[in-house]
Amino acid sequence: SAMIQGLKDRKYDIAFCSMMDNEPLIDFVPVAKQELVLIVPKGHPLEGRSSIDLKDTLAYPHIAFSKRSGLRHVIDKLFKKCGGYPQIAYSMEEDQGVAGLVGAGFGIAVVPKMPVLSYMPVSIIEIEKPSWERLFYMATLKNVYQAPAIMDFKKYVMDHANL
């Protein structure tokens, strides 16, 4: 992702992101959990469900996160667990953009549960299967000097991690 590249290029000292595979130069420390949910437009056949198995969504067009998003990798793994991949109608990088396309009726989507969803014309459905856990990580470049202010901030984040 752009954030990980920014760490490697020393543009950033710290990034908050999803875990990325094959990044041996980056130290990932879990700092928070986030729930993922399925959102569907009002009037969708799945609208009345309180929870769902993701394999029951495969027949419907999905709005996906772009491949540059760390979240796309996480969601693709969920679909791999349920044995299939949905048809991707559109892909976007921003979660609110994905939710906006769902609200406009362009498809359904797996997104982070976020307060803004309650103000959008979508129905939120808990994902029952497959089981999963999404963690946010504090990412830093390994084996480089970090100023005392950076070390203090890292300690503060770890002391207040929401796990």
Segments the model singles out, each with a brief description of its role:
Residues 37-39, 45, 108, 135-139:
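Residues embedded in well-ordered beta-strands
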Residues 18-19, 85-94:
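Short beta-strand-to-loop elements that line the ligand-binding cleft
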Residues 19-20, 42, 112-115:
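Short secondary-structure boundary segments
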